[in-house]
């Protein structure tokens, strides 16, 4: 039995696509139905190798890693204001994400790559109060989702 070139091409395309991981979308919003200056969703749990696409649904926002909430060995990143940013997360752990211009207003989110640690994460006490409050709420929603 002969396998056609087209069959081999289709099979390899399917295998390569499934090995790349999923793409998750996060909206960057000035106002949502619930609050102002938010990422929607504010918490994601993804697999290593998955990509998150940060979409500037409303203008004036970016997505950047939050110093102090980054797994050891992970690369920091910083997207441009008003630009869609895609970031692939390969190192397991908890990532804090911030909108740099709106950090003081609490525009932050968490991304858990892989399974959460059994110990509760320690968030930097130097963060603005609103940012710290929102991160703690996101951590609580993570606990409820278990």
Named regions from a protein language model:
Residues 16-18:
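N-terminal signal peptide c-region/cleavage motif recognized by signal peptidases
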Residues 1-7:
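Bacterial N-terminal signal peptides that target proteins for export
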């Amino acid at each position: 039995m002969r396998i056609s070139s087209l069959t081999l091409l289709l099979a390899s395309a399917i295998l390569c696509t499934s090995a790349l991981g999923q793409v998750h979308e996060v909206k960057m919003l000035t106002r949502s139905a619930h609050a102002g200056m938010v990422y929607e969703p504010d918490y994601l749990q993804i697999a290593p190798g998955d990509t998150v696409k940060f979409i500037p649904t409303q203008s004036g926002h970016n997505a950047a890693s939050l110093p102090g909430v980054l797994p050891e060995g992970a690369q920091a990143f910083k997207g441009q204001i008003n630009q869609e940013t895609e970031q692939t997360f390969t190192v397991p752990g908890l990532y804090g994400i911030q909108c740099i211009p709106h950090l003081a207003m609490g525009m932050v989110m968490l991304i858990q790559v892989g399974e959460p640690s059994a110990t509760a994460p320690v968030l930097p006490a130097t963060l603005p109060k609103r940012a710290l409050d929102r991160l703690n709420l996101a951590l609580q929603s993570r606990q409820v989702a278990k």
